[in-house]
């Protein structure tokens, strides 16, 4: 059986790591030992931050919705409560976009939310509200 030297595979692995480390500062971009550690760490940060990114965007959407709803005399929590009681299921991303670009439609949602809150405060049951709306 022929002798197998592993220079080709290790060189390919090193090239792969160094390619991923392009753009790094200092020895991290061209020394395999530091580049490998930096690439591993960068992948951990990327994995973590993909989740953090979702949290940050949800918080941004909520802030935008809250600001737009307060112009109509409601708070964010009351608005969402009213939408839930009215049976309107719109996610926060769409609500945020509507608040910025489609203010009339967003105003209609705020009115529906207020109506649901007022009606349920007076009547008390959700079924009566749905019967009155439909």
Curated annotation (Swiss-Prot):
Chain segments annotated as transmembrane: none
Keyword Ribosomal protein: yes
GO terms under biological process: ribosomal large subunit assembly; translation
GO cellular component: ribonucleoprotein complex; ribosome
The entry's keywords: Ribonucleoprotein, Ribosomal protein, RNA-binding, rRNA-binding
Top-rank taxon, per record: Bacteria
Alphabetized GO MF terms: rRNA binding; structural constituent of ribosome
SUPFAM superfamilies xrefs: Ribosomal protein L20
Protein family (similarity comment): Belongs to the bacterial ribosomal protein bL20 family.
Function: Binds directly to 23S ribosomal RNA and is necessary for the in vitro assembly process of the 50S ribosomal subunit. It is not involved in the protein synthesizing functions of that subunit.
Name of this chain's protein: Large ribosomal subunit protein bL20
Organism lineage: Bacteria, Pseudomonadati, Pseudomonadota, Alphaproteobacteria, Hyphomicrobiales
Gene (UniProt): rplT
């Amino acid at each position: 059986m022929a002798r197998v030297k592993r220079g080709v595979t290790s060189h390919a692995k090193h090239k792969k790591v160094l390619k991923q480390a392009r753009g790094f500062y200092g020895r991290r971009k061209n020394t395999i030992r530091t580049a490998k550690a930096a690439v591993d760490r960068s992948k951990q940060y990327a994995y973590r931050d993909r989740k953090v990114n979702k949290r940050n965007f949800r918080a941004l959407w909520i802030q935008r919705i809250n600001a737009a709803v307060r112009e109509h005399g409601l708070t964010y929590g009351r608005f969402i409560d009213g939408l839930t009681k009215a049976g309107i299921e719109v996610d926060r991303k769409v609500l945020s976009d509507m608040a910025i670009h489609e203010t009339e439609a967003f105003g209609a949602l705020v009115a529906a939310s207020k109506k649901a809150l007022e009606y349920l405060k007076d009547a008390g049951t959700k079924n009566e509200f749905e019967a009155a709306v439909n």
